[in-house]
């Protein structure tokens, strides 16, 4: 089993990033795929049209999300913790995922960087409401 941890800078305030990660319609906007999500502990979720499924464990509005991601019959839960920190450029999103099966690690690491984080970054960089004017 492996662990993944990385920080990503998202060009939006933590409150907005939190909503993008916890509101189904917003998830669908930035992923382009069907999503099921309720920001309530002990509820099931599905992202990217069932590519990622699991159970929500904990929420701290605007700051933290803890989920269990399912990997088939794996005996130990893979726990994902996302912490959102204020950053001069918006939000520092800290991602930590534990108990990743060795055979899935490269795909998971690539997915976090090239799909999950990149999708959020692109969503907010392209958002005219954010007023991304250069100073």
Residue ranges and their predicted role:
Residues 99-135:
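A conserved amphipathic terminal alpha-helix motif
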Residues 12, 51, 114-115:
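Generic recognition of short, well-ordered alpha-helical interface segments
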Residues 28, 36, 43-101:
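Hydrophobic-ligand binding "helix-grip"
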Residues 1-36:
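Hydrophobic ligand-binding cavity/cleft-lining segments
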Residues 5, 12-13, 44-48, 107:
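Alpha-helical scaffold segments that form or flank carboxylate-/histidine-based iron centers
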Residues 26-29, 40, 129-135:
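Structured surface interface patches that mediate subunit assembly and partner/cofactor docking
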Residues 21, 31, 60, 69, ...:
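Short, flexible helix/strand-to-coil boundary loops that buttress conserved ligand/catalytic motifs
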């Amino acid at each position: 089993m492996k662990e993944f941890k990385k920080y990503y800078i998202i060009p939006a305030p933590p409150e907005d990033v939190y909503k993008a990660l916890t509101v189904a319609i917003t998830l669908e906007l930035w992923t382009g795929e069907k999503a099921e999500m309720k920001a309530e502990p002990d509820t099931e979720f599905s992202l990217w049209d069932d590519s990622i499924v699991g159970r929500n464990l904990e929420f701290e509005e605007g700051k933290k999300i803890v989920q269990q991601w399912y990997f088939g019959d794996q005996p130990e839960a893979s726990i994902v913790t996302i912490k959102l920190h204020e950053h001069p450029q918006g939000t520092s999103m800290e991602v930590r995922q534990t108990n990743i099966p060795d055979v899935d690690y490269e795909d998971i690491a690539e997915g976090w960087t090239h799909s999950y984080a990149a999708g959020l970054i692109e969503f907010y960089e392209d958002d005219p409401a954010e007023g991304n004017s250069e100073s």
